[in-house]
């Protein structure tokens, strides 16, 4: 079969969360394949750190989250040229406690885009998360029959896991592509504040103080700071 990058030659590619760490890198990668027929979906305030992530990217259109969801809910003719959705937009805070917000922004939003994509013959790639695996003791095997046993440790993980479970129940998993990211770091994450990667925070700490703070250990066989 043809590669995903080859398929991006056709029609519009939508990247949700396109101004974020991963989304901006994905658009940069697509641009490097000489493709610019991209719609970027994100919330970007003028003069924000997020807006800076867009400076060197090429895309045809930028839409806010609410605007895009509305077009999808109406099955608007405006969307007829879309051939691929790369859905990376979500609340990625592992400490978020507003369950209703996570349910709407992470679960329902993904469900809406997936259903629309399947109804319209659009390729759908979405970000799940390694947070769905919980503490790892139940394995990390994403075979269909294994997915249900996972026990995420936080509401963010559950918001992602709920969609994976729905996709399995509805028989969507062989028609869509889910990506489970572990720790991601690199350029364009400054806007994430306290949710930046360990690498980003450590670099800043070392540059300022010559030292870095490590996480406390939650396992008896590793002392604090000795995790590897």
Task: Show which residues each predicted segment covers.
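Short-chain dehydrogenase/reductase
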Residues: 101-103, 152-161, 192-200
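Short alpha-helical oligomerization interface
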Residues: 94-109, 144-152
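N-terminal Rossmann NAD(P)H-binding glycine-rich loop of SDR-like oxidoreductase domains
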Residues: 13-33
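NAD(P)-dependent short-chain dehydrogenase/reductase
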Residues: 138, 165-228
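Glycine-rich phosphate-binding loop and adjoining beta1-alpha1-beta2 segment
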Residues: 40-68
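NAD(P)H-binding glycine-rich loop region in Rossmannoid oxidoreductase-like domains
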Residues: 65-66, 70-105
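Conserved Rossmann-fold NAD(P)-dependent oxidoreductase catalytic core, especially the SDR/UDP-sugar
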Residues: 84-87, 112-155
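Short alpha-helix in the Rossmann-fold core of NAD(P)-dependent oxidoreductases
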Residues: 105-110, 125, 159-160
